[in-house]
């Protein structure tokens, strides 16, 4: 069987203009940057399984959710993926991303910082805090990942 992939603990790295940090267990902790739309069509295949991402804490109803959305050129690999409730990923979070994309398309400067909140040693966040700054105006939104 394939060795389970994991990220380094307490690490900081950049991909596609975004900065990511991991916590003391190697879980995705923050993802942030100034949003930009990717310059190519289509989506890259996600190579990591939901089990690679959730380390056994994922639910059967979870999607492999991007922290920074694919449309914003968010990485399509382990460092940008979390077990995300499919209802949240395909509805509330997608609507949030749609609004941010409209702001980017309108030429506004949109900064997004996401912080994942994990219960105990779980690799599945139970909440995601999103801090958006659009042309200097900051808003905070919390998404529950039930």
Language model region names:
Residues 1-9:
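Single conserved hydrophobic/aromatic residue that forms the stacking wall/gate
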Residues 12-146:
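Domain-level detector of nuclease and nuclease-like folds
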